[in-house]
From Swiss-Prot:
It holds the Pfam family GCV_T_C. Decreases the sensitivity of PDP1 to magnesium ions, and this inhibition is reversed by the polyamine spermine. The keyword Cell membrane does not apply. Gene3D superfamilies: Aminomethyltransferase beta-barrel domains, D-Amino Acid Oxidase, subunit A, domain 2, FAD/NAD(P)-binding domain, Probable tRNA modification gtpase trme, domain 1. GO terms for cellular component: cytoplasm; mitochondrial matrix; mitochondrion; pyruvate dehydrogenase (lipoamide) phosphatase complex. Belongs to the GcvT family. Heterodimer of a catalytic (PDP1) and a regulatory (PDPR) subunit. The gene is PDPR. This is Pyruvate dehydrogenase phosphatase regulatory subunit, mitochondrial. InterPro entries: FAD-dep_OxRdtase, FAD/NAD-bd_sf, FAO_M, GCST_C, GCV_T_N, GcvT/YgfZ/DmdA, GcvT/YgfZ_C, Rhodanese-like_dom. Residues 1-27 form a transit peptide.
Amino acid sequence: MMFYRLLSIVGRQRASPGWQNWSSARNSTSAAEARSMALPTQAQVVICGGGITGTSVAYHLSKMGWKDIVLLEQGRLAAGSTRFCAGILSTARHLTIEQKMADYSNKLYYQLEQETGIQTGYTRTGSIFLAQTQDRLISLKRINAGLNVIGIPSEIISPKKVAELHHLLNVHDLVGAMHVPEDAVVSSADVALALASAASQNGVQIYDRTSVLHVMVKKGQVTGVETDKGQIECQYFVNCAGQWAYELGLSNEEPVSIPLHACEHFYLLTRPLETPLQSSTPTIVDADGRIYIRNWQGGILSGGFEKNPKPIFTEGKNQLEIQNLQEDWDHFEPLLSSLLRRMPELETLEIMKLVNCPETFTPDMRCIMGESPAVQGYFVLAGMNSAGLSFGGGAGKYLAEWMVHGYPSENVWELDLKRFGALQSSRTFLRHRVMEVMPLMYDLKVPRWDFQTGRQLRTSPLYDRLDAQGARWMEKHGFERPKYFVPPDKDLLALEQSKTFYKPDWFDIVESEVKCCKEAVCVIDMSSFTKFEITSTGDQALEVLQYLFSNDLDVPVGHIVHTGMLNEGGGYENDCSIARLNKRSFFMISPTDQQVHCWAWLKKHMPKDSNLLLEDVTWKYTALNLIGPRAVDVLSELSYAPMTPDHFPSLFCKEMSVGYANGIRVMSMTHTGEPGFMLYIPIEYALHVYNEVMSVGQKYGIRNAGYYALRSLRIEKFFAFWGQDINNLTTPLECGRESRVKLEKGMDFIGRDALLQQKQNGVYKRLTMFILDDHDSDLDLWPWWGEPIYRNGQYVGKTTSSAYSYSLERHVCLGFVHNFSEDTGEEQVVTADFINRGEYEIDIAGYRFQAKAKLYPVASLFTQKRRKDDMELSDLHGK
């Protein structure tokens, strides 16, 4: 019974007779009666899943005023993965949004017992994250810096301090650790039951032993659910079905892709130590040893994330409740050995049980939330990557905000279901990817690491040709993109194995590519960019785009407009360039990972008009970016047409012949601020055009380049990218893009009212460029992204992206500056004067480096100074 007390089944047994009904109108109904009650025929919201996520969503929706909610659980409440959760609540995460979710969960669970009267076993133990290597310690220092600035106490401690906090630990191989004192342990099942109880008291109806068969959809909108006990009409459906979320999504009349897959997850339970551990004993995370350790009733609970995980398929009839899977001591042996090395005194301790339970993982190790791009009203919260307890409270809150208000209070793009496409939902892909993901939970992740499984899923027609020329690849939205090109004299194996927080081994390679972009001409394959065409029989396309986009698109044919697709709050839902092909046709180019999100937003807001056509043409065109001053010479020679600015001005688009190929869309822009052209080539001509470009370009010093060079070029020019620097909570006025907004273009557009108000009231954050002056790129840790920014010693924001500028010979960071009141912490208006008068530091893993803040690209400042000098010289000669 000790095992089941740990997992809080006793909590269900000690509950009042009304627990199995949960309807606030029938609190005295017995469990048997509850299961036999008829379901309601309609509701506003139906939630599938009675675990930590489903009950959290129900709890928060009811707190926000929605009462007509039905929660369905196919077995018993909290009897799925929630029941087997190890009960560790940890706030130490790499992503800020995950840190905030876990912090909210911690505070929520702390007060649940007082709110509901249900004991949750909440005990504040703190956590200690061990480092056996200097790189691991650097990683912890980066996390520590991020935790501190959002108000989560943590500190880097010595091995000696570790031994003082946990006397059973062997610390001889440690170089340091991170202590997070407010982390906790809790009974996850009891937390779920407490959330359900509170939701029930707020009017939520909860029915167990009721299976959802499929979701009913009409014209792309949720209309109801079919259960084994009848139908319920509803406006919203929330899939919180855990490991069954994938299959439930595919069972719909209009399938919803939810890419997740389950693996077996092991942990052991021991009997109490001779001197039982105190309940406040800190939880230990030894990621280098691949294990976690927590106190459990005076003994030990310890599991981990092994290098060779065992994926589980979920075809066939679903189990109503998850059972303990078969023990596998041979498989667990490496984790057990690691545990005994860390805590040698456990050698003689009696082990009670080896628990084997399923955990779901996603292709990128981040949970899945949000509305389906295919079905309006279909929301998902699943794929918690063994962090369901830590994220459950915060994730449930954000999803509830999404449903009630139309968007969450934080930027959750990194967790949005729409970051995936159907291509990531292949069961074979998921099986292979989760076998990589599960070990990565504790692997050391240095900047710019890449997944190794599920690769070469989407490729340019030039992939083999570029690969043969030394391309090293990264993956974005399933698309292979070149990082850089390895010269023949470089050690390829050494480059592939090079992982560091310091100066990377590819530094010189990218320097050569950047230099070529500035002095000669380079080619970058950018075929992964999202491409849409919007056409109409009349003026419908222009009218719709004028309403959806902030800039004025009523421009002459052939002109390109940089613009944004904004939400009601004025934030960027999409950042793109649009070329007017003719009076009734437009060509739209967006970031790679915007493909699903942008399509869903357009379809949601475009009228149902048979005279209006939206087409995804991403796959139809190969995109080559010709960057550099000699790009004009290459293209002139290949097209036999003048390409000088007089004949081909900036931000202009024209269909041309290049080599033997016709119909090439040539655009005078490069996404870098450097001169050059984008070529959008029908895929059947791609190889020919590339070969011709490289052949003719030889005399002009042409070479291939990759996205690392592009990143360096665009950051030093202060070019912000959507998803990295700006998001749906960023307005054009906050990132210096007022010129891309036409408030007086003659018609209303989404977000206009919010921008007018912001223009009057001022902005509360501002995207700023930072140049590190006292930073030694050869010896010091590099900035990558997410580093805290300090102004006059006070925290004001974080970096969003960073790169080494080979022109300035300095690191350049982009990031948002806020103006927090020193007295109240409230945000105040940020002005140019506020930014310019501050002295700044960037915190890189606990070390602060002085930085100069700029609101405009340095190149522009140099140009302005040169023009001023020229004017002064002219005036002098005039005198």
